[in-house]
């Protein structure tokens, strides 16, 4: 969205169901599916594929195909490098077809590179604080933030509707806000009620006892002791 100054208009969601024969899923206390893909249709006609979940070969990779070349972060060796590719007939004379380099952030490079997700963990907080300091709205303002988050909600609606396309409403428009004003659709068990969806395409199910026991041990080792996620030392979780 930032690079192309576009927003998603429609989404299709697809999932790989929960696999009880996969130890990484069976021993998890979460009630969710293995992985998911969201296909977003942007308002300029572009298509974005977002793949995420509990798949082997974990990594954070971005690949962008434009009409003047390709840019992606490297999947081998130093993964913070960028690879830029231009077709031989589209590049300038003397310009290489392929360039691989490690970029610097234009601001706060040192601090950003010491945080996770390639600097993303730093810049989310940095730009939030800059908005407070300067009283200026950042590019990723509340509406663009909603655009990004509601794409996932609508994609889950799509999953439960045989992956049919669903709109991503633009809440800058009063008519769209009015249409969804009383929409409280959520798979959160804390909001359970009539018409609320499950968090897995397989429906509602309970993690097995061994998975819950393991979760208690892990969370206790990190100091979480209650279902309110209060940090009170190294006590055990009382419940999930």
Model-predicted regions and their roles:
Residues 77-93:
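C-terminal, non-catalytic macromolecule-binding modules
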Residues 19-22, 72-74, 168, 175-178:
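A short beta-to-alpha transition loop/helix N-cap that caps and shapes the active-site region
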Residues 51, 65, 169:
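Residue-level detector of conserved, well-ordered beta-strand and adjacent loop positions
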Residues 1-47, 51-58, 143-147:
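Rossmann-like dinucleotide-binding domain that binds NAD(P)(H)
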Residues 58-62, 88-240:
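C-terminal helical cap and adjacent loop that interface with cofactors, partners, or active-site loops
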Residues 53, 74-77, 171:
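Surface loops and adjacent helix of pleckstrin homology
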Residues 42, 66, 92:
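Acidic surface patches and DE-rich sequence motifs
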